[in-house]
A protein has these predicted regions:
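Bacterial signal peptide processing site
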Residues: 24-27
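C-terminal structured "cap/appendage" subdomains that terminate the fold
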Residues: 433-476, 482-486
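Short, surface-exposed ligand- or partner-binding patches at beta-edge/loop junctions that are enriched
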Residues: 166-172, 309-323, 459-473
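C-terminal substrate/ligand-recognition segments
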Residues: 370-380, 384-427, 442-462
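C-terminal motif of bacterial Sec signal peptides marking the signal peptidase cleavage site
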Residues: 19-22
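Histidine-centered copper-binding motifs that mark active-site loops
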Residues: 31-298, 304, 310, 336-353, ...
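Active/binding-pocket-proximal capping segment
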Residues: 271-282, 411-439, 472-475, 484-489
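Sec-dependent N-terminal signal peptides
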Residues: 5-16
Length: 529
């Protein structure tokens, strides 16, 4: 995916993308990209400009909001604004005035209540990525349209058995997702409790939120249209360029690595230290595993423990990376620096397990579905089972309480990160080879011309939700489908009504064609069951 046209204005990663794709591109020095000529051009790489950034400043965590007595209540005043990114004033979109949205920190069983005031000139909405909550009403309903100028309530009732770990939130209105996330509308959401599963000696280790968030700037503003992932891009950690963190020799730290950007991938390495993965996509792992590198497509999260063996400087870098012949080629960049000094901290044994994996590999499979991701690079259109997203078309209906196996094929010559809302899944096989899952997950890359087999159980929540490619440009340009989870296994009247309301609201906000055939007057298409 090179240039995009916005319509409206874990181990499995490493196994698939290193083995089946490899990496390409020339390594470049860490730091800002050399400024292009600035000559007007239709090629985004020629019009994006770099901006002066402060580098190597002390690390700053995003602002944090914590629940009190079971409730986290806040206001998101969504508006265009000018904020500071790495020492430079940049225009973009914000939830609470900053490029980094506040970190929301809650506990299982809590209620999250957001008063969302949309002060944009376009519609928006809000999504809690990876969260096991209801997809209907004023909850995690991405089919809801929050109109320009409107005031809205967004309420999450977290189950008491929701898994602890790192989630994130972002705008999710089809046709506007890439531009709004790229402009700044994303942040981290943490469900506490992961540390409680660690050995007592590790439960109070430093807890660092490290949100990977990128931007491109032209004329002092974040680019929001004709975004080209190969154009000069500033990669930040919490909005900082190469911030400096400190640690004591042999100290253990918890790093919450989250790719909360719109389109680009990261191939992370921490020179001289290793990643000990304790949770993937906010799912505590049944077996703690160790990696020298981690690949994070858009939307991916890893909670990792890191121990600094000797004094010195350690660079967190993203290495050169290719997503395939028709995909993107990313350069090497330094993201953060860890300065390790002081007396050696005594050794502490690593944990071996933080939670069981649901035994989906032994479950009875009630239904098998074939899902095909495809694209037309010449027209910049993307498809699931031959169709672009249509708010009047339900792709699948699933019955509550059943287990399904999906065989997801990617016919494109670039990787697509598959994501589904509400229910996480377990990877069964990659390109026909059995896969040993250490946890469930909510994002998995589909290799170019490859195949991934997953299983998921629809255990509690009913309602219509979506699955899609988490390269948000691809989602906006068609690569998304709707799944209706019902008690009967038949399309619900409530879903038909809500989709018609969504379609009416979207057409009332803009007249852009949302894909092949998604126009006023369409009748509801019957889904595959």
């Amino acid at each position: 995916m090179r240039k995009t046209v916005v319509l409206a204005g874990g181990p499995v990663v490493a196994a698939m993308l290193v083995i089946f794709m490899g990496c390409s591109g020339d390594a470049t020095k860490a730091g800002p990209v050399a400024s292009p000529s600035g000559t007007p051009s239709t090629d985004q790489r020629d019009v994006v400009t770099t901006f002066p950034t402060e580098q190597h400043q002390p690390f700053e965590a995003p602002p944090e909001l914590k629940s009190t007595n079971g409730l986290l209540e806040t206001t998101f005043d969504v508006h265009p604004t000018t904020f500071n990114v790495a020492g430079a004033e940049v225009r973009g979109y914000a939830y609470q005035g900053q490029f980094m949205g506040p970190t929301l920190r809650v506990l299982p069983g809590d209620v999250v209540r957001v008063h969302l005031r949309n002060r944009l000139k376009e519609p928006t909405n809000l999504h809690s990525h990876g969260m096991y909550v209801s997809p209907i009403g004023i909850s995690d309903n991405v089919l809801r349209v929050m109109k320009a100028g409107s005031n809205n309530e967004f309420v999450l009732h977290l189950p008491r058995d929701v898994e602890p770990g790192t989630y994130w939130y972002h705008t999710h209105l089809h046709g506007h997702v890439e531009e709004q996330v790229f402009a700044g509308l994303s942040g981290v959401l943490i469900v506490d409790g992961l540390q409680d599963r660690l050995p007592p000696q590790l439960q109070d280790v430093p807890d660092q939120v490290m949100a990977l968030k990128d931007l491109q700037v032209k004329d002092g503003a974040i680019v929001r249209s004709n975004i080209d992932s190969n154009a000069p891009t500033t990669r930040t950690v919490n909005g900082q360029v190469d911030p400096v963190l400190t640690a004591q020799t042999n100290q253990t730290q918890l790093l919450r690595l989250a790719n909360i950007g719109a389109d680009i991938w990261y191939r992370l390495r921490l020179g001289g230290a290793q990643f000990h993965v304790i949770a993937e996509d906010a799912n505590p792992v049944a077996e703690v595993w160790t990696a020298d590198e981690l690949v994070l497509p858009p939307g991916k999260r890893y909670d990792v423990l890191v121990r600094w063996p000797t004094p010195g400087s350690y660079a967190l870098e993203t290495l050169t990376y290719s997503t395939g012949p028709d995909g993107d080629n990313y350069p090497q960049r330094r993201l953060a620096t860890f300065e390790v000094t002081g007396d050696t901290v005594p050794d502490v044994a690593w944990p071996t397990s933080l939670g069981p994996v649901s035994p989906l590999d032994t479950d009875h499979v009630d239904r098998t579905r074939n899902v095909v991701f495809s694209e037309n690079p010449k027209t910049n259109r993307f498809y699931i089972n031959g169709k672009q997203f249509d708010p009047t078309h339900v792709t699948f209906v699933a019955k509550l309480g059943t287990t399904e196996e999906w065989v997801i094929k990617n016919t494109a010559r670039e990787a697509h990160p598959f994501h589904i809302h509400v229910n996480d899944f377990e990877v069964m096989a990659v390109n026909g080879k059995p896969y040993h899952a250490r946890s469930e997950q909510d994002v998995v890359p589909l290799p170019p011309r490859g195949e991934v087999r997953i299983r998921m159980h629809f255990k509690h929540f009913v309602g219509a939700t979506v699955f899609h490619c988490h390269i948000l440009a691809h989602e906006d340009n068609g690569m998304m489908g709707i799944i209706d989870i019902t008690r009967s296994g038949r399309l619900s009247k409530a879903t038909i009504k809500s989709l018609k309301e969504m379609n009416k609201a979207m057409l009332g906000q803009h007249s852009t064609d949302m894909g092949d055939g998604a126009h006023t007057g369409h009748t509801m298409e019957m889904p595959s069951r």
